[in-house]
């Protein structure tokens, strides 16, 4: 692997999920072209991947105006999170209240309501290290457990609580990794996301917490691509019996994953300039 440049600041942070410099063609090609077309700007690249083993070596040499490179593998962090020492925690009442406010806003006005986005932003800001919604509380607190049980009873159409529990954990835990990345990222003047998804959430969080411009280039329409992947995926269970299933209806867990990626996209578009 090529040595990674490090810098104290940069002009533009490129937030790249599963693309340049590890994957050739497509998105990576035009990212490479953009960087080389603007030699007057100093770029910082934040690469987001699934697991380190899923990527080989760089397919592109980093241009000279890439002054900083860092990489984060979100599902390796999920595995590390499950290795945290479980211990009794009550949770932060402020953080729990913010999550409940978000759920209430969703129920009252739907996902497109302005109050739902405002409540989501309040939750996102508290995911940062030192915030009221700590990863340890999400994983182990009594308040988190009670809230999870309530959501399962009120909304889950799948009979398996075990699958619901682990789906929610796996789905949401990368957001705390991204919040840590957002807080630790070097100073930049602007942020550019090649897509929505996890990179888009990181971009939205940086724009929100640092008040810097966010540019979004939707290549391939990320959310639709994720929907196609979710329709095809065999690892998402449907535990309903033949009498409970509606052939015309998606399974609950597929709906949950789709709603999650739609929210990441909605947040990024809301914050983009």
Locate each region found by the language model.
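Short, solvent-exposed beta-strand-terminating loops
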Residues: 214-234
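A short, glycine/small-residue-rich beta-strand->loop->alpha-helix junction that serves as a flexible
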Residues: 18-29
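Short, well-ordered alpha-helical microsegments
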Residues: 31, 199-202
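Short amphipathic alpha-helix
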Residues: 27-38
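A conserved catalytic-core segment of Leloir-type glycosyltransferases
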Residues: 7-9, 44-179
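Short N-terminal targeting/anchoring amphipathic segment
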Residues: 113, 183-198, 209-215, 219
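Membrane-proximal helix-turn-helix segments that form the acceptor-binding/catalytic region
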Residues: 177-187, 222, 240-273
């Amino acid at each position: 692997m090529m040595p990674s440049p490090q810098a104290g600041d940069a002009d533009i942070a490129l937030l790249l999920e599963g693309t340049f410099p590890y994957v050739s063609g497509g998105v990576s090609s035009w990212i490479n072209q953009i960087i080389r077309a603007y030699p007057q700007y100093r770029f910082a690249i934040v690469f987001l991947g699934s697991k380190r083993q899923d990527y080989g070596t760089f397919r592109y040499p980093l241009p000279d105006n890439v002054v900083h490179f860092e990489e984060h593998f979100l599902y390796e962090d999920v595995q590390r999170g499950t290795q945290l020492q479980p211990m009794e925690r009550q949770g932060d009442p402020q953080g729990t209240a913010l999550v409940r406010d978000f759920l209430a806003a969703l129920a009252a006005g739907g996902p497109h309501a302005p109050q739902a986005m405002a409540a989501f932003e309040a939750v996102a800001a508290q995911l940062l290290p030192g915030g009221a919604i700590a990863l340890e509380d999400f994983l182990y607190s009594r308040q988190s457990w009670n809230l999870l049980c309530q959501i399962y009873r009120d909304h889950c159409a799948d009979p398996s609580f075990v699958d619901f529990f682990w789906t929610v954990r796996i789905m949401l835990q990368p957001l705390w990794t991204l919040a840590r990345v957002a807080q630790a990222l070097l100073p930049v003047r602007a942020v550019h996301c090649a897509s929505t998804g996890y990179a888009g959430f990181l971009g939205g969080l940086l724009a929100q917490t640092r008040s810097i411009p966010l540019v979004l280039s939707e290549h391939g329409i990320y959310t639709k691509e994720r929907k196609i992947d979710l329709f095809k995926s065999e690892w998402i269970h449907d535990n309903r019996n033949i009498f409970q299933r509606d052939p015309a209806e998606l399974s609950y867990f597929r709906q949950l994953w789709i709603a999650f990626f739609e929210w990441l996209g909605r947040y990024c578009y809301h914050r983009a300039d």
